Amino acid sequence: MKQGKFSVFLILLLMLTLVVAPKEKAEAASSGWQPVSGISGCKIRVITDAYTYTKSATSIDAYAETNGKCGKLNYKSFGVSIVEGGDIGPQYSGYFSSRTPTKKFYFSKLPKPTGTPWAVGLSVYKGKAKGAAFVYINPQKR
C-alpha cells in the first residue's frame, strides 16, 4: 500500500513540476536608454522581441520609446541593418511622443543571415536636437 501511495505522490509531483516549471521563451533585447542631444533629460531606447532569432522565427518585432521627457519626436530610418554593412529591408519614418507602433520585419523579406550581427534602430530629431538608438541582434543562418 505504501508503494502505491508513493507512486501516486511521485506522479502528482511530476505533474506539478511540469505545470509550474518556467517555459523557455525569447528574452527581449533593449538598446538601453540613449540621450537625445539638445533636449534636456530626453532619452530613447529600442526594444526587440529577442536577442537571438532561431531559424523558426518569422519576424523581428521592434518598437522605440521615450522616457517621457522628450515631447513629440520625429524618427527616420527605423529599420534593420547589417552591422558595418548598411540598411536592409524596409525603413520607416514618422513621429511619436511615448512609443512607436511595433514594427515587424519579416525574415522572408530580408537577406538570409550569414552569421554577421544585425542592428535594429532608428534616428530621431526635433529641430536641431538629434539622437539614435540601436539594438544588436543575432539572427541564425537560414
UniProtKB/Swiss-Prot annotation:
Signal sequence, start to end: 1-28
What keywords are assigned to this protein?
Cell wall, Secreted, Signal
Identify the GO cellular component terms for this protein: extracellular region
Where is the protein localized?
Secreted, Cell wall
Quaternary structure annotation from Swiss-Prot or TrEMBL: Found in a complex with F(1)F(0) ATP synthase and SpoIIIJ and YqjG.
Q: What is this protein called?
A: Cell wall-binding protein YqgA
**Gene that encodes the chain:** yqgA
